[in-house]
Structures are given as C-alpha cells and as structure tokens.
C-alpha cells in the first residue's frame, strides 16, 4: 500500500515558493491562506486540501504530480 510522505510534500511546497522568490507571507496572501497554515504545510504538520493544492499549483506554476512526488521531472503548470 502507498504511504504518503507529508514532509516531502512540505519540502516541495517550500521549494516551489522559494523558486518563485516569494516570502511565506507573500505566498500565503497569494494562495489565500493564513501564514500559520502555510507554515504547517511546509513543515509537514498538515496537508492541503485538494482545492488548496490546486491553488498552490497555480500560484507557484507547478504540477500537482510534482508537488505530490508522483513525477520528479521539472515543474510544470497545474493541469498540463
């Protein structure tokens, strides 16, 4: 059975944010969540909902496959 790695997701969320040159505060505002929620995600303490995951993909211009670790290739736009 597949076991999901919340910490890896958090690392990818942080990596994508940094690649876009965004502070945590800027990213939280762009995604529409509180700074504490973004911190929880990046630390692997919580996982985003499917809707929030899509917002992250659009804000950071990455694919859900990449964020979730399904595909490790270069980042792609969500939905492509």
Task: Locate each region found by the language model.
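Short, charged recognition helix plus adjacent turn
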Residues: 1-2, 58, 68-80
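Short alpha-helical DNA-recognition segment
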Residues: 21-40
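Residue-level detection of the helix-turn-helix DNA-binding "recognition helix"
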Residues: 18, 32, 43-45, 72
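Alpha-helical residues within the helix-turn-helix
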Residues: 18, 29, 58
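DNA major-groove recognition helix of helix-turn-helix/homeodomain DNA-binding modules
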Residues: 51-66
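A short, Lys/Arg-rich alpha-helix, primarily the initiator
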Residues: 1-19
């Amino acid at each position: 059975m597949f076991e999901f790695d919340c910490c890896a997701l958090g690392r990818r969320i942080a990596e994508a944010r940094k690649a876009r040159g965004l502070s945590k505060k800027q990213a939280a505002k762009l995604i529409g969540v509180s700074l504490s929620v973004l911190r929880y995600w990046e630390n692997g303490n919580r996982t985003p909902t499917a809707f929030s995951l899509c917002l992250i993909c659009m804000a950071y211009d990455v694919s859900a496959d990449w964020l979730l670790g399904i595909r490790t290739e270069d980042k792609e736009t969500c939905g492509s």
